[in-house]
Amino acid sequence: MQGRTQVAYNGSFGISTVYKNLKMLSGDEFRSVASERGISILDKGNNTNFQKEIQQTGLQQNHHVAFYGGSSTSSYRVSLGFMDRQGVILNEDMKNFTSNMNMNQKMFDGFFDCELGMFGSILKNHNLVDYQKTFYSAATFNPTYPNHKDPVTNSWDGITTASQITNPLAWMQVDDDDATSHISTHARFTFNLMKELKLVLFGAYTYNIVENSQYLPTSVWANGQAYKGTKKMESLLGNMMLTYKKGWKKHFFDVLALAELQKET
């Protein structure tokens, strides 16, 4: 099917869920044990399982589509991809977009061969800031507390006397995001000057940027905290290669000359 554009697609879909949780006291069991042992507790009258409150069913999907075609002297391929991953914890997810293009063209009866390519991607993550505090708090936080904010103060109820234990639902409102954007291009020109002599010119450019942002409200961090940062990187590469290969009687000559320049910022 030379000369005709063909299309290929593949995709997948999945679900992830928590298999097992730590066995902790429910609100009713907590009250019962406290009553039996004569222990005074702060009872807000609820029966909340905070481990399950911060969990979700994570949906996962992948999609990839490609367009390609060509002939004996020219060919091309363009592809697009998308990946979406939800974690089993609220507000934990990853998205990735990719694109790729390659083209090859031969001209002048094989004297000149041109190859061009470009790749780009965008990766976005929403992360959990502190795994230890999140899961420790979910397992040990007072189960008589509600699973919603105080309607009067519009804030999460906390326990000021508890060390390293914060309302786990407050951790779900923390923002910790990072995004990575990447693009790379290249070009290769091959000149078949003679049967034995070949000249190759190659150039490539890469650009990468990483952005980080974080926001911790006062409900989980004493005075609150906010951060935003950006890191950029550029790379430029170029080289020229001349090769000569020749067989003569019982001998074989293979000569290579190479010049290269690279710059990174």
Where do the protein language model's features map onto the residues?
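A beta-strand signature from Gram-negative outer-membrane beta-barrel systems
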Residues: 1-8, 60-62, 81-86
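Outer-membrane beta-barrel transmembrane strand signature
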Residues: 41-68, 73-83, 152-192
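Surface-exposed loop/interface segments of Gram-negative outer-membrane beta-barrel transport/assembly proteins
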Residues: 2-46, 88-92, 98, 102-182, ...
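Transmembrane beta-barrel domains of bacterial outer-membrane proteins
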Residues: 71-75, 79-82, 87, 99-104, ...
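Outer-membrane beta-barrel channels and translocator barrels
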Residues: 60, 71-72, 107-110, 192-194, ...
